[in-house]
């Protein structure tokens, strides 16, 4: 199975390969810069080459880049929209440089513009990107708090339909659970993945953020827990990981570092739960 974690690129993006190996991962996710500031990736040719070579030699892949937390594709504000588009263009260009096939992004919040206008804003913003042929933008499912979009699978479908780009999807299990899609039992997992297939299509599911949830289903609260130890729980996680629809989908963890346990413990847990 392909499972890894979101790892640091401190000291150079090529260090992500070693960091991934250190936690037992064989695929993974990175930020190309601090996600809390507007900043373009600064990746030198030598470190990009070392990253590509290290990935090819030591990992199964694929990697995914997580875009900045400041990006808001749904915004009605022209200045924020322009910054979001510029930031996303820099990310897809960095992905091409690094040989990373995916850039993951949250749709953002409509901040009062309304769901339909927010979805239109997101689709049209994505249409302004010049995405390299070897890179795909993944729309991430959201927990659905406030005016954030992406919590409803229909939101994902609408953006994929309204945009002229060739887009796919990343499901975050904690987000989907918080948004009201139950994953705590085998029956619930079957129902949720069937619902996703009906609305979006499992052919669009290219990556999973595998996280348990510290809060109950439908609370719209986004706080991750160790695998099998949150409200999704061991039974739900086992059912999800072993579902036929997930068998070949790469899994990346964004689980907490607490109680003396980090990514290595959680990756081992995932492998233990895989039948």
Curated annotation (Swiss-Prot):
Enzyme class: hydrolase
Cofactor(s) listed in the protein's UniProt record: Zn(2+)
UniProt entry keywords in alphabetical sequence: DNA damage, DNA repair, Endonuclease, Hydrolase, Metal-binding, Nuclease, Zinc
Upper lineage: Archaea, Methanobacteriati, Methanobacteriota, Stenosarchaea group, Halobacteria
Cited Pfam families: AP_endonuc_2
Residues noted as binding Zn(2+) 3 in the record, renumbered to the chain: 175, 222, 224
InterPro entries per record: AP_endonuc_2, AP_endonuc_F2_Zn_BS, Xyl_isomerase-like_sf, Xyl_isomerase-like_TIM-brl
Gene this protein is translated from: nfo
GO terms (BP aspect): base-excision repair
EC identifiers of the protein: 3.1.21.2
Keyword Transmembrane helix among UniProt keywords: no
Taxonomic superkingdom: Archaea
Residues that coordinate or bind Zn(2+) 1: 66, 106, 140
PROSITE patterns linked to this entry: AP_NUCLEASE_F2_3, AP_NUCLEASE_F2_4
Gene3D superfamilies (UniProt xref): Divalent-metal-dependent TIM barrel enzymes
The protein's name in its UniProt record: Probable endonuclease 4
Protein family membership: Belongs to the AP endonuclease 2 family.
Catalytic activity: Endonucleolytic cleavage to 5'-phosphooligonucleotide end-products
Coiled coil, from the record: none
GO terms of molecular function: deoxyribonuclease IV (phage-T4-induced) activity; DNA binding; DNA-(apurinic or apyrimidinic site) endonuclease activity; phosphoric diester hydrolase activity; zinc ion binding
């Amino acid at each position: 199975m392909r499972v890894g974690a979101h790892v640091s690129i401190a000291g150079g993006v090529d260090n992500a390969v070693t960091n991934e190996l250190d936690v037992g991962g064989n695929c993974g996710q990175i930020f190309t810069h601090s996600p809390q500031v507007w900043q373009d990736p600064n990746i030198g040719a030598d470190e990009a080459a070392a990253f590509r070579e290290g990935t090819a030699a030591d990992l199964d892949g694929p990697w995914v880049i997580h875009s900045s937390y400041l990006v808001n594709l749904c915004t009605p504000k022209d200045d924020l929209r322009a910054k979001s588009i510029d930031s996303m263009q820099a990310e897809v260009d960095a992905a091409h440089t690094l040989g990373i096939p995916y850039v993951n992004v949250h749709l953002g919040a409509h901040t009062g513009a309304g769901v339909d206008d927010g979805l239109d804003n997101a689709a049209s913003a994505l249409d302004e990107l010049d995405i390299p042929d070897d890179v795909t933008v993944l729309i991430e499912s959201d927990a659905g708090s406030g005016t954030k979009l992406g919590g409803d699978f229909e939101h994902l479908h609408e953006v994929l339909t309204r945009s002229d780009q060739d887009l796919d999807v990343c499901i975050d299990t904690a987000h989907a659970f918080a948004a009201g899609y139950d994953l705590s039992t085998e029956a619930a997992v079957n129902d949720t993945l069937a619902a996703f297939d009906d609305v979006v299509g499992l052919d669009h599911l290219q990556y999973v953020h595998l996280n348990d949830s510290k809060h109950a289903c439908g609370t719209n609260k986004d706080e991750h827990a160790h695998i099998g130890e949150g409200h999704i729980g061991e039974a739900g996680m086992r059912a999800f990981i072993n579902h036929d629809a997930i068998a070949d989908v790469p899994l990346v963890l964004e689980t907490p570092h607490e109680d003396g346990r980090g990514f290595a413990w959680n990756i081992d847990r995932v492998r233990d739960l895989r039948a």
